[in-house]
């Protein structure tokens, strides 16, 4: 019998500084990250949550699929956009976070 671990919550796209004036998009959100971690450990995981029906939402869906996470209950919301977080780094390596408002 195969046990599936269901991860419920947010999936966000983190925007990290790659070089001056350029941000790199990375998958984020603790529940989505946990689902990926379980799958990488050969576990059977699934993600339940909502993203926007937009390019960031499609990026999150494709990333989870590529990581072998079941996304059948991941909803693409046409009324709200995918959550995004801009991550900043100060001179000491401390992170700051700017969360976009009204996400999915």
Task: Give residue spans per PLM region.
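Hydrophobic/small residue at the entry helix of a nucleotide-binding pocket
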Residues: 30
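Alpha-helix C-terminal capping segments
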Residues: 33-44, 89
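Conserved N-terminal subdomain of the carbohydrate kinase-like
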Residues: 44-104
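Short glycine-enriched, charge-decorated loop/helix-capping segments at active-site entrances
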Residues: 20-26, 102
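Positively charged, low-complexity intrinsically disordered leader regions
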Residues: 1-22
């Amino acid at each position: 019998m195969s046990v599936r671990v269901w991860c419920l919550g947010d999936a966000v796209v983190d925007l990290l500084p790659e070089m001056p004036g350029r941000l790199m998009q990375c998958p984020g959100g603790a529940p989505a990250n946990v689902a990926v971690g379980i799958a990488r450990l050969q576990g059977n995981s699934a993600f339940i949550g909502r993203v926007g029906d937009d390019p960031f939402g499609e990026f999150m869906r494709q990333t989870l699929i590529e990581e072998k996470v079941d996304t059948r209950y991941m909803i693409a919301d046409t009324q709200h956009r995918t959550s995004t977080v801009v991550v900043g780094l100060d001179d000491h390596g401390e992170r700051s976070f700017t969360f976009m408002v009204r996400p999915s």
